[in-house]
């Protein structure tokens, strides 16, 4: 059994840093390989293509800046770049999580077992196949919750002035919360905790989850490091589950 943090709740920054340590633990590494490969292939290809398009996209986005804000262009330009990286990174992170969802759930389950010494249900390829419909239904629930809110925020980008100042900040906060939901959901879902109940549980420690999601969002924008972020975030979120939520919500002890 690995000791995570003596079951004392810590900050979201702590759990994110724990993810980097836990991902390389003996016995856990083999469950990291498939999520890691999915993320490397998808995020690596996506960000390579993105950087070939930035010279076209950023001027197009800046064209929405009204003349009376042109004097702020030296501030708005980096905000525009960050906005594109945030939106693009979150979109492809979501896609990668869809593809790797069954393996992320297995990684969270095996790590939880090692952190707690508890015995998980029988797993393996047949267990994953049996749970696949439930896992994909859960991913649809997350998408249905996320999409309407994301569309509203994206519309803000096309409002002159607002789109280049307020919208990037709102999108960062939203993506931080959504990434906390995305990764914390794997251990919650392993214990069949309903999606709405999971969101309510996360709100009881909103600052911790926003810290965790904000760091995950930032690292998703950083080339090379973003290739490893999926399994790291799953491990960090699982450590948070063990310390903060498991006692109340665990299905298996």
UniProtKB/Swiss-Prot annotation:
Compartments, as annotated in UniProt: Cell inner membrane
Segments passing through the bilayer: 31-51, 72-92, 151-171, 222-242
Gene Ontology cellular-component terms listed: plasma membrane
Cysteine disulfide partners in this protein: none
Keywords: Amino-acid biosynthesis, Cell inner membrane, Cell membrane, Cysteine biosynthesis, Membrane, Sulfate transport, Transmembrane, Transmembrane helix, Transport
Record's bilayer topology term: Multi-pass membrane protein
A GO MF label: high-affinity sulfate:proton symporter activity
Protein name: Sulfate transporter CysZ
Organism listed in the record: Escherichia fergusonii (strain ATCC 35469 / DSM 13698 / CCUG 18766 / IAM 14443 / JCM 21226 / LMG 7866 / NBRC 102419 / NCTC 12128 / CDC 0568-73)
């Amino acid at each position: 059994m690995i000791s995570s943090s003596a079951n004392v709740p810590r900050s979201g920054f702590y759990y994110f840093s724990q993810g980097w340590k836990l991902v390389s633990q003996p016995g856990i590494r083999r469950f990291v390989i498939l999520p890691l490969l999915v993320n490397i292939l998808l995020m690596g290809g996506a960000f390579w293509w993105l950087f070939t398009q930035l010279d076209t996209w950023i001027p197009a986005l800046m064209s929405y800046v009204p003349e009376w804000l042109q004097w702020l262009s030296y501030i708005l330009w980096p905000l525009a770049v960050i906005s594109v990286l945030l939106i693009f990174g979150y979109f492809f992170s979501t896609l990668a999580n869809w593809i790797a969802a069954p393996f992320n759930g297995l990684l969270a389950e095996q790590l939880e077992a090692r952190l707690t010494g508890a015995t998980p249900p029988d797993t393996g390829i047949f267990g994953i196949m049996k749970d696949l419909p439930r896992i994909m239904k859960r991913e649809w629930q997350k998408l249905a919750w996320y999409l309407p809110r994301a569309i509203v925020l994206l519309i803000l980008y096309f409002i002159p002035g607002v789109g280049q100042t307020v919208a990037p900040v709102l999108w960062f906060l939203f993506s931080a919360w959504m990434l906390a939901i995305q990764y914390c959901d794997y251990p919650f879902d392993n214990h069949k905790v309903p999606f709405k109940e999971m969101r309510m549980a996360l709100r009881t420690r909103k600052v911790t989850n926003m810290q965790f999601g904000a760091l995950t969002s930032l690292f998703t924008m950083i080339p090379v490091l973003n290739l490893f972020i999926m399994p790291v975030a799953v491990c960090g979120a699982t450590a948070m589950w063990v310390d903060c939520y498991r006692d109340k919500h665990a299905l298996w002890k």
